[in-house]
């Protein structure tokens, strides 16, 4: 079904797109770092909440992408387009509701999650949260559109849009942060504008009826409950899984926030570097949805095994390469941040721990489960993620970071323990082949 050329055309733009997506967060942090560590800390704390909400949009988009991919594999393009339209409406509705809630309750949420943090950190966090919330609908619509393009095997279009969005973001940061000294507000405004532009462009492109999947008469709402149910069968468990994952990260961030501004900043910078480190793996995981989803639609289970193994080998190769490269140039990379010596040392310490664990188990913990999701085996991945997160990541974070007084290093070691547990579970599940029994959704 997919030649090596087809896989390259799908994967390479995805890697570039994911690199650019993570760059937005890194550029924000690097540029705001010139305004002081309080601004960096404020953005970091809000982003832990943002990621929780944004992951819901991504999960819904994944549900739509899986259904669309399966219909494409079956050759039913009309149903694929119908699924796309339902995904658009659902994404817009969910993001609008969450955006309104975040705008009006941002201060109580910040106080509830992070408790008493320094006043200047809270000031930056509040304005960043407000502007981020306004951008939620744009981001949700863009995520939905990007997922649909990937379902068609067209990741080049989303890559080009991502390049434009990042250009807008970087230029906006330069003007608002350096020119107008807007700090966190400037970073959030630039991101808001870039997301709005991306959402508009990708929606317009999907109105073209010549595409395999397109938005048919978007101005005339039509809700097909059976189709929406199929999307939600994937999106809801995936959303719960990812939400639990982000809630766990927020709880860990609340532990880190108790160690002071230096620890918060080190955790934020190390988090940015860690995201960059696994970008190729994230891209391969996204490609897994498209490839396996279409194989599932065609009911070709041998192809599922073949392409999953092939993509996993590629994932391991690129994660190893990226990790070695970043460790070799870690000092040069950290020099872009305006960090104190103590913060730099702490950042480097946890980044090394992450690198060692990433090359061993990250692909099994985060790329392989996408093959299960593409086969609709989302309940299993949700249950494993829920148990692993709460038992290992959160439980061991309290034990290592607080009881054994290891600080943020303890939270990162706990994260690695979580990875090993979930990775083992996903390997066993895929090998046993139970996903074949729930692999196709028929309306």
Name each model-derived stretch.
Residues 23-41, 110-119, 175-184, 243-270, ...:
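Helix-terminus/linker motif at the lipid-water interface of multi-pass membrane proteins
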Residues 1-14, 68-135, 179-236, 292-358, ...:
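Short alpha-helical transmembrane segments in multi-pass integral membrane proteins
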Residues 61, 131-150, 158-169, 187-202, ...:
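Short runs within selected transmembrane alpha-helices of multi-pass transporters and secretion channels
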Residues 32-51, 119-124, 184-185, 189, ...:
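Interfacial/gating helices of multi-pass transporter permease domains
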């Amino acid at each position: 079904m997919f030649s090596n050329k087809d896989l390259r055309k799908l994967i390479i733009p995805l890697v570039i797109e994911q690199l650019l997506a993570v760059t937005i967060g890194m550029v924000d942090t690097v540029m705001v770092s010139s305004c002081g560590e309080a601004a960096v800390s404020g953005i970091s704390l809000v982003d832990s909440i943002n990621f929780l909400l944004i992951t819901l949009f991504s999960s819904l988009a994944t549900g739509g992408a899986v259904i669309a991919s399966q219909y494409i594999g079956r050759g039913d393009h009309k149903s694929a387009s119908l699924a796309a339209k339902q995904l658009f409406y659902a994404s817009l509705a969910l993001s609008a509701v969450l955006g309104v809630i975040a705008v009006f309750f941002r201060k109580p949420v910040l106080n509830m999650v992070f408790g008493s943090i320094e006043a200047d950190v809270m000031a930056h966090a509040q304005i960043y949260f407000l502007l981020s919330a306004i951008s939620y609908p744009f981001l949700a619509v863009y995520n939905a559109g990007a997922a649909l393009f990937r379902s068609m095997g067209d990741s080049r279009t989303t890559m080009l849009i991502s390049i434009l969005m990042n250009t807008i973001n970087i230029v906006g940061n330069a003007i608002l942060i350096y020119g107008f000294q807007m700090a966190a507000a400037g970073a959030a405004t630039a991101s808001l504008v870039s997301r709005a532009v991306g959402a508009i462009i990708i929606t317009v492109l999907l109105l073209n009826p010549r595409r395999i999947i397109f938005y048919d008469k978007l101005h005339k709402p039509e809700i097909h409950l059976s189709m929406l149910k199929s999307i939600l069968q994937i999106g809801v468990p995936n959303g719960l899984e990812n939400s639990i994952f982000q809630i766990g990260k927020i709880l860990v961030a609340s532990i880190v926030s108790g160690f002071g501004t230096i620890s918060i900043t080190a955790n934020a910078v190390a988090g940015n570097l860690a995201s960059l480190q696994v970008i190729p793996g994230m891209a391969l995981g996204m490609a897994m949805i498209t490839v396996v989803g279409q194989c599932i639609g065609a009911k070709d289970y041998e192809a599922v095994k073949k392409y999953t193994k092939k993509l996993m080998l590629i994932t391991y190769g690129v994660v190893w390469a990226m990790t070695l490269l970043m460790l070799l140039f870690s000092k040069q990379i950290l020099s872009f941040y305006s960090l104190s010596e103590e913060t730099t040392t702490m950042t480097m310490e946890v980044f090394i721990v992450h690198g060692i664990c990433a090359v061993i188990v990250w692909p099994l913990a985060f790329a392989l489960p996408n093959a299960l999701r593409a086969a609709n085996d989302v309940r299993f991945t949700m249950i494993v993620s829920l148990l692993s997160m709460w038992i290992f990541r959160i439980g061991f974070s309290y034990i290592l970071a607080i009881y054994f007084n290891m600080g943020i290093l303890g939270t990162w070691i706990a994260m690695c323990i979580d990875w090993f547990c979930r990775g083992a579970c996903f390997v066993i599940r895929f090998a046993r082949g139970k996903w074949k029994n729930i692999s196709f959704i028929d309306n």
